[in-house]
Design a protein with these regions (language model features):
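Internal gly/pro-rich beta-alpha loop/helix module
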Residues: 1-18, 29-30, 34-40
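Thiamine diphosphate
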Residues: 1-8, 41-195
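Mobile "lid/hinge" segments at catalytic clefts and subdomain interfaces of large enzymes
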Residues: 19-22, 146
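Short, basic, glycine/proline-bearing loop/turn elements
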Residues: 21-23, 114-115
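Short catalytic-loop micro-motif centered on adjacent basic/acidic residues
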Residues: 22-25, 86
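Short beta->alpha connector loops at strand-helix junctions that form conserved
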Residues: 25-28, 164
Length: 195
């Protein structure tokens, strides 16, 4: 199936490095509608919509308003926030599935959908703190692309799940699994953080 030329891991980082560019990676149909609205209403910023070819479910908690702020809590912790998983695009669903498994193990996480880093960075400090509070330093980012740019959100104590090597030739599901983008691997990484 798809080989390395269809796995452009550097493209998100390259697009995000363009001044004033908004790179939006929606995770489902609700986020896509919000992203489209932002793109057509934008008069100052060029916008790149990064979409998946995968079938993705509409997620409970998806928010048009959240997308307009660049990032938002799509999966709130039950009681206390042991860790935060930050994801974009189709990986948000992966993060939500991992949240369910982690809760079974007694680990209570928050899931943040971050479709647009640039818009989130423009929010006021209070909003950013409400989504990514400073006192929760156990953070994991999940994006099937270069790690470039994610360290500022996870900090020195966090883990970045990314792809920092050339792609592979195989059916999509095999490639995804070989790079570790599975519920089990997300759970394992969160467990490393909270120990």
């Amino acid at each position: 199936e798809d080989g390395p030329t269809h796995q452009p891991i550097e493209q998100f980082a390259m697009l995000r490095s363009i001044p004033n560019m908004h790179v939006i990676r929606p995770g489902d149909a609700v986020e896509m509608a919000a992203a489209w609205k932002l793109a057509i209403e934008s008069k100052e910023n060029p916008t790149a919509l990064i979409l998946t070819r995968q079938n993705v479910e509409t997620m409970a908690g998806s928010s048009v308003e959240g997308v307009s702020k660049g990032a938002y809590i799509i999966g709130k912790e039950e009681k206390q926030c042991d860790a935060i998983i930050i994801a974009s695009g189709s990986e948000v669903n992966l993060a939500m599935n991992a949240k369910t498994e982690l809760l079974k193990k007694g680990i209570d996480v928050r899931v943040v959908s971050m479709p647009c880093q640039e818009i989130f960075d423009q929010q006021d400090k209070a909003y950013k703190q409400s989504v990514l509070p400073n006192d929760v330093r156990k953070r994991l980012s999940v994006e099937m692309a270069s790690s470039f740019g994610w360290h500022k959100y996870v900090g020195l104590d966090g883990i970045v799940m990314s792809i920092d090597e050339f792609g592979r030739s195989a059916p999509a599901n095999q490639v995804i699994e070989s790079f570790g983008f599975t519920v089990d691997k997300v759970v394992e990484n969160v467990e490393k953080l909270v120990k």
